[in-house]
UniProtKB/Swiss-Prot annotation, chain A:
NAD found in the keyword field: yes
UniProt name for this protein: tRNA uridine 5-carboxymethylaminomethyl modification enzyme MnmG
Keyword annotations from UniProtKB, A to Z: Cytoplasm, FAD, Flavoprotein, NAD, tRNA processing
SMART domains for the chain: GIDA_assoc_3 (SM01228)
GO molecular function: flavin adenine dinucleotide binding
Gene name, Swiss-Prot/TrEMBL: mnmG
From Swiss-Prot, chain B:
Signal sequence segment: none
Alphabetical list of PROSITE patterns matching this protein: G_TRME
InterPro entries with a match to the protein in the record: G_TrmE, GTP-bd, GTP-bd_TrmE_N, GTPase_MnmE, MnmE_dom2, MnmE_helical, P-loop_NTPase, Small_GTP-bd
Residues noted as binding (6S)-5-formyl-5,6,7,8-tetrahydrofolate in the record, renumbered to the chain: 23, 88, 127, 462
Residue intervals of the TrmE-type G domain: 224-383
EC numbers, comma separated: 3.6.-.-
Localization (cell): Cytoplasm
Gene Ontology MF term list: GTP binding; GTPase activity; metal ion binding
Oligomer status and interactors: Homodimer. Heterotetramer of two MnmE and two MnmG subunits.
List of residues binding K(+): 234, 253, 255, 258
Keywords, alphabetical: Cytoplasm, GTP-binding, Hydrolase, Magnesium, Metal-binding, Nucleotide-binding, Potassium, tRNA processing
Any one of the GO CC terms: cytosol
Entry protein name: tRNA modification GTPase MnmE
C-alpha cells in the first residue's frame, strides 16, 4: 500500500558504521534526519573483526572524533582491550587499536542514535529512490511508504545483492545471514549506475571454553590508559587479552588437498577480493614455502564465549573448516560456533562520485562506505561523516566540505576513490598518504577541530579547551626556542645519562631537544617551565621540534599542492572541445571530471602535457562548456 | 606536480656566441642563485634591486671551488619574461663550464625546464597574447612527444635496465618498511632496522654513483666526447687540430690519471663537446700510434668515442692507411680526405669501401674548405642526425644527470637521518623520494606499485 511516510531534510539508508556517522552528523548539524535500516538490532554491527583502529585506520577514528563523530567515543566506552601500535617507530605511524565488545558496541551506538535530537530511527527496507529530473527527492520502502528528503545518503555496506558462499553452497544473503538488499541494487542499475562485484570473507568463530590457551601466546593490552576520543576522560582498565597461535604444516596439507572444494578456485566466486586480507587458502597457495601463518584469537566480548579466529578467513566447506581447526595448536578441540564464509556484493564504481560523495548521476544523492568499494569499519565511518555533513549542508543550503589529502586520511581515502577508483575492496594504508608525517595520530585535533567547530559538530566547551591546548603548545615551543641551557655539571650529568655527548657551550633548549637521545622530559628537567605542561602539550612540543626538518619538507610539498588545488576546473567543462589532449587523458577526464588541476594530475593516464594543455585553456578562460540539458 | 616550482635551463644556443646564459624562473630563483653566487664585495642577490646585473663567481657549495666567472642579472616579478622572479647567469661561452653551472643550479633546487616551458609560463602568467594559445599547445604536445622519444631511445639498453633494477631494490626496501608499519604484529616479517636500512641505502648510493660515472651520455656531457685524430705523417692532423681549436677556443688541460705524455684539449663543435686526446703528439707531427706503440694506441682507440681518421687526397692509399682502417673497425669514425686543393691521387672508391658507410668528408684545411661539413658530420653523429644543436638530446642527458644527482642527494639525506637516529619511517621519506626521482628518468612513477609490491612480497591477511 503506497502512502506518504513523512518529509525530512536528510534520509540515511543503512545504519552500519557509515550510516551511523552520516545520520549523527546530519542530525547534529541541525538537519531533520531519518535513518532507515533493515534490522534495528544490527545497528553498528561488526560482521568481521571485533576490533577498531590500527595503522592508518586508527588515525581515521581520531579524525572522525576531531570532526565531532561518534566512532571514537563509542569504542572508548566499549573496548575490552586497547593498544598503541608502532610505539618503536616515528610519530607519524603510531596508531591505536582496540578490541571491541561487539554487542556492547552496538548497544551503545543504538542508544546514542535513539537519544539524538533531530534523528528518527526506522526499521524498513528501501527498494527504490524517488528521482525526478536527475534529482533525488526521497525513498520508497518495501511496505510502500514514501519518505521525502532534500538529500539521501546510501550506506548499504555489503548488502547489495549479497551472496554468501561456503564450499559449494551459495545463497542470497547479507552478512551474517541478514536479509540482502536486491531490489535497491537493481534500481541503481536502472538509474544508470555502473556496479562492480566485490568479495570479502570472514573466518570461523569458536567457543572460548574449548580452546587450550596453554598452547598459545598471550597478547595483553597496554597498561597505560588510552582512548580514541579527545573527549574521553574515563578509561577502561579491566582489559582482556588476545592470544596468538600458528597454522601448521598439517593445516597447509589439508588446504592443499581440498583446494578443489574452495569456491575461490572452483570458479564459483567471481568477485574481486582484497589482496590485504586474503583467505587462508590464498595465503597457502601464494606463499607456499611459508611453514606457518599467524592466527590471533580475539574475544568478541565480555558477555560471550565466542572467539574470532583472525588469520583463518576461508570459504572452504564447513567440514574442512572443522578439520583445519583441529590442526592448530590450542584449537584441536575447539567447537566451531559459526563457519567462515565469503560474501559477494555489489559496489558502485566510485569514480561516479564527486569528492563530496554526491553522485554525479543523481543530484542530492550521496553514497558512503562499503558500497563505494572500500572495506573496513573505519573507512566506512570516515566516508559516512563526510557524506552526512555534505548531505545536511545541501539540505540546509550550506557550503560543500571536502578534505584535502594534506588535511586527513579521510581526504586521502575519498580522493583515491573518486579520482582513481579501485579494482579491489579499498583499504587505507599509511603508504597511501604522501603527507603522512603531517597526518599523525597525535595531531588529528589540531588538523580538524577548527573545521568540526565551524560546521557545528564540536561543542563550544570542547573548542575552548582545544584553543587553550593550541596556545599552550605555541607558548612552550617559543620558550624552548629562547631558553638557553648552560653546560653546568648537573646538565652534563643528565645528558651523559641519556647517552649523549656533553655540551661545549650554552645551547637553546629546542636545539638540545633535537638530539636523538633527548626527550621533552629531559628538557623539562634541565629547564623547567613555569606552568604545568599537560602530557598532550608536551607530546606536540616534542614532535614538532624534534622532527621539524621533515615536517617543513612536507609542508613545502603541501604548499605546492595547495596552489594546484586552487586552480579550479569548472564542473561543466567540455573536454571534447579542448584540442591537443591525448585520447586516454580525454576519456579519463570526462569520466572523473576533476574539480581542480591537483585532482586532474592524480588521474592515471593523464600526463603532464595534458595538464599543461588544461592549464592553458583555464588561463585563457576559453573553456567550452557542456550545456546542462 | 611541477607547475609551480623553479625551473632552469641554458637559454642560449649551444656552442655559439661568446656568452652562454643559464636562466632560472620561479619563486626560488633568487634564493637558488644566492646559494651559488659569490660576489667580491660580499653582497647577496636577495638584497640587490630588481633589474640589475652583478659581477662575481659561481662556487660549488659542496667543494667551495670556483666553477665560473659570471655576470648575474636579477629581475623580479612581475616585469620579467615569465612574470616570475628571473635570474640569468651569464657564463663564458663553451659547453663544459655552462653545463656545470646548470648542473649546480639543478642540484640546488631548480628543476630542468621542459622544452618550451619558459614560454609556457610566460603564457600562463598572462604575458603572451591570446592568439598564441594554440601555438603554445602545439609546442607542448610536439616537444613532449619528441622529448619522450629521445628519452625512450636513450633508455633502451643498459642505463634503463640498471635504473629499473635499482628502483626495484628500493621498492622492496620501502615495502618492507611499510609492512612493518601497516602490519606491526606480523612477527614473521623481519623488522627493517636502521642498520639494515643503512646497508640498503649505501648500496643504492653506490649504484647511483656508479651510474653517474658510467652513463656514457653523462660522461660525455661532463667530460666531452673522447676524440682521437689519427693518420699518417703529413696528412694534416695538426692543421685539423688547429682548425678545430682555432674555431672553437680550445682549453688545454693536463688530465690527471691519464698517461703523462697524453695531453687533452677541449673544443666545442656545434654544441658537441670534444675532448681531443694526445694533442701534444699531433702538434709534434707524430702519430699516437708511433708515439705510444701499437698496443697502447689500440687501447686508446678502444676508449675513444670518436675517431677522426685523416687521409691524403694527393697520395694513393698506403698499407698504413689500410692498417688504420683495420684498427678502427666498428668504431665511430669520420674519414677526412684532406688536401683537396691538390690533384687527386687517392682511390675514392676504395676509401668508401674501407669507410663501410661511415661518414667521409673532403677538406682542404689549408684553404679552410670543408670545415663546416666536418663540424656538421660531428654534430650529426652525436645527435643521431635527428636533432639540431641545442635541442633535446643534450637536454635529456642533462636531465638524467640532474635526476641522478638529486636521487643521490635524497639517499644521502636518508643516510644522515639514520646517523642522527631518526625513525625508519621518516628516513623512508627520503628513500621514497630517491625512488620517485629515478622513476622520472625511466618515465615511471606509479604510486600504486608500492602497494602492489607490499602484497606481492609479504603474506598478510585476516
Amino acid at each position: 500500500m503506497e502512502y506518504h511516510g513523512g518529509s525530512y531534510d536528510v534520509i540515511v539508508i543503512g545504519a552500519g558504521h557509515a550510516g551511523c556517522e552520516a545520520a549523527l552528523a546530519s542530525a547534529r548539524i541541525g538537519a531533520k534526519t531519518l535513518v532507515i535500516t533493515l534490522n534495528l538490532d544490527m545497528i553498528a554491527f561488526m560482521p568481521c573483526n571485533p576490533s577498531i583502529g590500527g595503522p592508518a585506520k586508527g588515525i581515521v577514528v581520531r579524525e572522525i572524533d576531531a570532526l565531532g563523530g561518534e566512532m571514537g567515543k563509542n569504542i572508548d566506552k566499549t573496548y575490552i582491550q586497547i593498544r598503541m601500535l608502532n610505539t618503536g617507530k616515528g610519530p607519524a605511524v603510531r596508531a591505536l587499536r582496540a578490541q571491541a565488545d561487539k554487542v556492547l558496541y552496538q548497544r551503545e551506538m543504538k542508544k546514542t542514535l535513539e537519544n539524538q535530537k533531530n534523528l528518527t530511527l526506522l526499521q524498513g527496507k528501501v527498494e527504490r529512490l524517488i528521482v525526478e529530473d536527475g534529482v533525488c527527492k526521497g525513498v520508497i520502502t518495501q511496505t510502500g511508504a514514501h519518505y521525502y528528503a532534500k538529500a539521501v545518503v546510501i550506506t548499504t555496506g555489503t548488502f547489495l545483492r549479497g551472496e554468501i558462499i561456503i564450499g559449494d553452497i551459495k545463497y542470497s544473503s547479507g552478512p551474517n545471514n541478514q536479509q540482502p538488499s536486491i531490489k535497491l541494487s537493481e534500481h541503481l542499475e536502472e538509474l544508470g549506475f555502473e556496479l562492480v562485484r566485490f568479495k570479502t570473507g570472514t573466518p570461523p568463530r569458536v567457543n572460548s571454553r574449548t580452546i587450550d590457551y596453554s598452547k598459545t601466546e598471550i597478547q595483553p593490552g597496554d597498561e597505560e590508559p588510552r582512548a580514541f576520543s579527545y573527549e574521553t576522560t574515563k578509561y577502561i582498565t579491566d582489559q582482556l587479552p588476545c592470544w596468538l597461535t600458528y597454522t601448521t604444516e598439517e593445516t597447509h596439507r589439508i588446504i592443499d588437498e581440498n583446494l578443489h572444494l574452495s569456491p575461490m578456485y572452483s570458479g564459483m566466486i567471481k568477485g574481486t577480493g582484497p589482496r590485504y586480507c586474503p583467505s587462508i587458502e590464498d595465503k597457502v597457495v601464494r606463499f607456499h614455502d611459508k611453514p606457518r601463518h599467524q592466527i590471533f584469537l580475539e574475544p568478541e566480548g565480555r558477555e560471550t564465549e565466542e572467539v574470532y579466529v583472525q588469520g583463518l578467513s576461508t570459504s572452504l566447506p564447513e567440514h574442512i573448516q572443522r578439520k583445519l581447526l583441529e590442526t592448530i595448536p590450542g584449537l584441536e578441540k575447539a567447537q566451531l560456533m559459526r563457519a567462515g564464509y565469503a560474501i559477494e556484493y555489489d559496489a558502485i564504481v566510485p569514480t561516479q562520485l564527486w569528492p563530496t560523495l554526491e553522485t554525479k548521476l543523481v543530484k542530492n544523492l550521496y553514497t558512503a562506505g562499503q558500497i563505494n568499494g572500500t572495506s573496513g569499519y573505519e573507512e566506512a565511518a570516515g566516508q559516512g561523516i563526510m557524506a552526512g555533513i555534505n548531505a545536511a549542508h545541501r539540505a540546509l543550503g550550506r557550503e560543500e566540505i571536502i578534505l584535502s589529502r594534506s588535511d586527513a586520511y579521510i581526504g586521502v581515502l575519498i580522493d583515491d576513490l573518486v579520482t582513481k577508483g579501485t579494482n579491489e575492496p579499498y583499504r587505507l594504508l599509511t603508504s597511501r598518504a604522501e603527507y603522512r608525517l603531517l597526518l599523525r595520530h597525535d595531531n588529528a585535533d589540531l588538523r580538524l577541530t577548527e573545521l568540526g567547530y565551524r560546521i557545528g559538530l564540536i561543542s563550544e566547551e570542547r573548542y575552548q579547551a582545544f584553543l587553550a591546548k593550541k596556545e599552550a603548545i605555541e607558548r612552550e615551543k617559543k620558550r624552548l626556542q629562547t631558553v638557553i641551557i648552560k653546560p653546568t655539571p648537573e646538565v652534563q650529568e643528565v645528558i651523559r645519562q641519556a647517552g649523549g655527548s656533553e655540551l661545549k657551550d650554552g645551547i637553546r633548549a629546542a636545539d638540545l631537544l633535537r638530539r636523538p637521545e633527548m626527550t621533552y622530559e629531559h628538557i623539562q628537567k634541565l629547564a623547567p617551565a613555569d606552568e604545568d605542561i599537560a602530557p598532550e602539550v608536551a607530546e606536540q612540543v616534542e614532535i614538532q621540534i624534534k622532527y621539524e626538518g621533515y615536517i617543513q619538507k612536507s609542508l613545502q610539498e603541501v604548499e605546492r599542492l595547495k596552489k594546484m588545488e586552487n586552480k579550479k576546473i569548472p564542473e561543466d567543462i567540455d573536454y571534447d572541445a579542448i584540442q591537443g589532449l591525448a585520447t586516454e587523458a580525454r576519456q579519463k577526464l570526462k569520466q572523473v571530471r576533476p574539480l581542480s588541476i591537483a585532482q586532474a594530475s592524480r588521474i592515471s593516464g593523464v600526463n603532464p602535457a595534458d595538464i599543461s594543455i588544461l592549464l592553458v585553456y583555464l588561463e585563457q578562460g576559453r573553456i567550452a562548456r557542456v550545456s546542462n540539458e | 606536480m611541477t607547475e609551480f616550482d623553479t625551473i632552469a635551463a641554458i637559454s642560449t644556443p649551444m656552442g655559439e656566441g661568446a656568452i652562454a646564459i643559464v636562466r632560472l624562473s620561479g619563486d626560488e630563483a633568487v634564493e637558488i642563485a644566492d646559494r651559488l653566487f659569490r660576489s667580491p664585495t660580499g653582497k647577496q642577490l636577495k638584497d640587490v634591486p630588481s633589474h640589475t646585473i652583478h659581477y662575481g663567481h659561481i662556487v660549488d657549495p659542496k667543494s667551495g671551488r670556483i666553477v665560473e666567472e659570471v655576470m648575474v642579472s636579477v629581475m623580479r616579478a612581475p616585469k620579467t619574461f615569465t612574470r616570475e622572479d628571473v635570474v640569468e647567469i651569464n657564463c663564458h661561452g663553451g659547453f663544459v663550464s655552462v653545463n656545470r653551472v646548470l648542473q649546480l643550479v639543478l642540484a640546488n633546487g631548480a628543476r630542468l625546464a621542459e622544452p618550451g616551458e619558459f614560454t609556457k609560463r610566460a603564457f600562463l602568467n598572462g604575458r603572451i597574447d591570446l592568439s598564441q594559445a594554440e601555438a603554445v599547445i602545439d609546442l607542448i604536445r610536439a616537444k613532449t612527444d619528441r622529448a619522450m622519444n629521445v628519452a625512450l631511445q636513450q633508455m633502451e639498453g643498459r642505463l634503463s635496465k640498471l635504473i629499473r633494477e635499482l628502483r626495484q631494490t628500493i621498492l622492496e626496501t620501502l615495502a618492507h618498511v611499510e609492512v612493518n608499519i601497516d602490519y606491526p604484529e606480523y612477527d614473521d616479517v623481519e623488522e627493517m632496522t636502521p642498520r639494515l636500512l643503512k646497508e640498503k641505502a649505501e648500496y643504492v648510493r653506490g649504484q647511483i654513483e656508479k651510474l653517474l660515472s658510467t652513463a656514457t651520455q653523462g660522461k660525455i656531457l661532463r667530460e666531452g666526447l673522447a676524440t682521437v685524430i689519427i693518420g699518417r705523417p703529413n696528412v694534416g692532423k695538426s692543421s685539423l687540430l688547429n682548425a678545430l681549436a682555432h674555431e672553437n677556443r680550445a682549453i688545454v688541460t693536463d688530465i690527471p690519471g691519464t698517461t703523462r705524455d697524453v695531453i687533452e684539449e677541449y673544443v666545442n663543435v656545434r654544441g658537441v663537446p670534444l675532448r681531443l686526446i694526445d694533442t701534444a703528439g699531433i702538434r709534434e707531427t707524430e702519430d699516437i700510434v708511433e708515439r705510444i706503440g701499437v698496443e697502447r694506441s689500440r687501447q686508446m682507440l678502444k676508449k675513444a668515442d670518436l675517431i677522426l681518421l685523416v687521409l691524403n687526397y694527393h697520395e694513393p692509399l698506403t698499407e698504413e692507411d689500410e692498417r688504420l682502417f683495420a684498427m678502427t673497425e666498428g668504431m665511430d669514425v669520420i674519414v677526412i680526405v684532406n688536401k683537396t686543393d691538390l690533384p687527386q691521387n687517392i682511390d675514392i672508391e676504395r676509401v668508401k669501401e674501407l669507410a663501410a658507410g661511415r661518414p667521409i668528408v673532403a677538406t682542404s684545411l689549408l684553404c679552410e674548405r670543408g670545415i663546416d661539413e666536418l663540424e656538421k658530420a660531428i654534430a650529426d653523429l652525436f645527435f643521431g642526425g635527428e636533432l639540431e644543436a641545442g635541442d633535446l638530446t643534450y637536454v635529456s642527458n642533462s636531465r638524467h644527470i640532474a635526476l641522478l644527482e638529486q636521487a643521490k642527494k635524497a639517499i644521502e639525506d636518508a643516510l644522515s637521518g639514520i646517523d642522527v637516529g631518526m625513525p625508519v619511517d621518516l628516513v623512508q621519506i627520503d628513500l621514497r623520494r630517491a625512488w620517485e626521482l629515478l622513476g622520472e628518468i625511466v618515465g615511471d612513477t606509479v604510486h600504486e606499485s608500492l602497494i602492489d609490491q607490499l602484497f606481492a612480497q609479504f603474506c598478510l591477511g585476516k
